[in-house]
């Protein structure tokens, strides 16, 4: 665990464009003979202003890595920093504030409040925190995600793709340092999934955001700048400028010759029409 002497990130964490990093990150569940080592002394740097995908076979530790980097789960050993803030030693109240103010989240389930309309769902975390959104930034996010004509619609009046766009806007609304997306296209058809991936790509390219996405889909990973491959709780490989075919081939190496998922059209086309 962290010590009082290690409260700052490694030198130049922000200056060198690092949004988050971990050193010797270890996460174990259970004890004794039943111990399961989900993460095994992982070192990782998440580059600021880039789209990073995390992939691996089932049980490889990819979701656990995201949860530990985001402060959603405690670590068994090692250190994690968000920017220049070490989060492994923070109290729960401080972690809650950090997640609220500096991190955005997207999940496979949209987690929208059914009684609120789209814009109310988008601003809800900031409303709860007593913060006012930057209206210029919020307008830019809404227009980038194509939600201008859907702001008064409740979730039941929106398609799955539109609901995930609302969830994406909610993650972006506070202009966070880092967005974590856990299987964000898992509940969507291929067309809606393409749109959401396109919007995450735009969030990085046009809005200057940093995105870390956990996915099992090689096509989804192909929208990223960098893919990190996990196996048995360790980062075992990485791929710059990935394609779906290259990711699929790499995944076969970690899955005993059987790929986790087929390559999908998400890597071959970009979203065009609105839902």
Predicted regions and their residues:
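Pre-NBD coupling/linker segments of ABC/ABC-like ATPases
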Residues: 2-14
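Long, low-complexity, intrinsically disordered segments
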Residues: 268-275
């Amino acid at each position: 665990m962290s010590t009082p002497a290690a409260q700052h990130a490694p030198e130049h964490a922000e200056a060198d464009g690092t949004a988050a990093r971990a050193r010797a990150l270890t996460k174990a569940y259970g004890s004794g003979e039943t111990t399961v080592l989900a993460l095994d002394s992982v070192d990782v740097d998440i580059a600021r202003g880039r789209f990073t995908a995390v992939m691996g076979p089932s049980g490889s530790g990819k979701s656990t890595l995201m949860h530990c980097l985001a402060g959603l789960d405690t670590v068994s050993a090692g250190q994690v920093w968000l920017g220049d803030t070490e989060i492994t030693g923070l109290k729960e109240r401080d972690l809650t504030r950090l997640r609220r103010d500096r991190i955005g989240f997207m999940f496979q389930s949209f987690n929208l409040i059914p009684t609120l309309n789209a814009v109310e769902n988008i601003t809800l975390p900031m409303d709860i925190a007593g913060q006012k959104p930057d209206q210029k930034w919020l307008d830019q996010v809404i227009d980038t995600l194509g939600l201008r004509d859907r702001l008064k619609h409740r979730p039941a009046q929106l398609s799955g793709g539109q609901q995930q766009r609302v969830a994406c806007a909610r993650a972006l609304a506070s202009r966070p340092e880092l967005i974590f997306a856990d299987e964000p296209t898992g509940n969507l058809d291929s067309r809606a999934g393409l749109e959401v991936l396109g919007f995450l790509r735009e969030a990085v390219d046009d809005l200057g955001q940093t995105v870390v996405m956990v996915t099992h889909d090689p096509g989804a990973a192909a929208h990223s700048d960098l893919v990190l491959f996990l196996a048995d709780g360790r980062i075992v490989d990485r791929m710059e400028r990935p394609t779906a075919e290259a990711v699929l081939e790499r995944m076969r190496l970690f899955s005993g010759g059987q790929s986790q998922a087929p390559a999908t059209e998400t890597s071959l086309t970009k979203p065009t029409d609105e839902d």
